[in-house]
């Protein structure tokens, strides 16, 4: 069949159906969402949990959510902007920060459900494949599925750094090593040491050393915050090791104290009846005084 021109007549516009709002805005892939959200029909009221990972310009957002008719319910959330509390003050959107955010999410969630002592996850970071398995006689491992949104799921994407952090933190998330840094698509082999380097920020440290030797100005420009916070390439691994330990020690979110706001009033408040009567009396007295002065003169 050849090219058929769409005739936009009255019937076309009468029967036109707009797409979902978030599809029109280019925010949600409903083809993927349908498959992530729909639960098995023999599980009835059991929610299907998703690990949502979104990378913005200055932050990494990790959430555990499940879908309801009214909208998605967020069970737990962790953000990269919380990492300065654990000793990571710079590079809050790199692969190592994504791993830390995923780890924080997992430990916080398990702590909330009282499962943090049962499922410790992988304490020693190796970068190798690790899967959480349910322990007999204990509650089953918390299972969820990665929701990468509209991100391109290429090998080495930061989304998978957050996933690895969550798995090492004790969550059961189906995955393979094919999308981790260190996987070679030609030889079909996975090098765990390369992945570990990314988790420990060694790829950034190597680039810092390279720039320091090759172009001092570019180094000062690109790593200005590292210089300001006295973070050198040799400190990187120790910094992330301490952060991982600190996250495991205390993953609980601390609520900020509510800021007292003093309300400002821009218009005059209404007067009470007594104030109005007093004002009238004052005006009367003022008027009478003026009359007396006029009579005297």
From Swiss-Prot:
GO terms for biological process: ribosomal large subunit assembly; translation. One of its GO terms (molecular function) is structural constituent of ribosome. The modification N6-acetyllysine is found at residues 5, 48, 220. The modification N-acetylglycine is found at residue 2. Its main location: cytoplasm. CDD domains: Ribosomal_L18_L5e (cd00432). Residues 253-297 are annotated as: Disordered. Keywords: Acetylation, Cytoplasm, Isopeptide bond, Nucleus, Phosphoprotein, Ribonucleoprotein, Ribosomal protein, RNA-binding, rRNA-binding, Ubl conjugation. There is a cross-link at residue 220 (Glycyl lysine isopeptide (Lys-Gly) (interchain with G-Cter in SUMO2)). InterPro entries: Rbsml_uL18_euk, Ribosomal_uL18_C_euk. Pfam families: Ribosomal_L18_c, Ribosomal_L5e. Disulfide bonds: none annotated. Component of the large ribosomal subunit (LSU). Part of the 5S RNP complex, which is a LSU subcomplex composed of the 5S RNA, RPL5 and RPL11. Component of a hexameric 5S RNP precursor complex, composed of 5S RNA, RRS1, RPF2/BXDC1, RPL5, RPL11 and HEATR3; this complex acts as a precursor for ribosome assembly. Interacts with isoform 1 of NVL in an ATP-dependent manner. Interacts with RRP1B. Interacts with IPO5, IPO7 and KPNB1; these interactions may be involved in RPL5 nuclear import for the assembly of ribosomal subunits. Component of the ribosome, a large ribonucleoprotein complex responsible for the synthesis of proteins in the cell. The small ribosomal subunit (SSU) binds messenger RNAs (mRNAs) and translates the encoded message by selecting cognate aminoacyl-transfer RNA (tRNA) molecules. The large subunit (LSU) contains the ribosomal catalytic site termed the peptidyl transferase center (PTC), which catalyzes the formation of peptide bonds, thereby polymerizing the amino acids delivered by tRNAs into a polypeptide chain. PANTHER family: LARGE RIBOSOMAL SUBUNIT PROTEIN UL18, RIBOSOMAL PROTEIN L5-RELATED. This is Large ribosomal subunit protein uL18. It comes from Oryctolagus cuniculus (Rabbit).
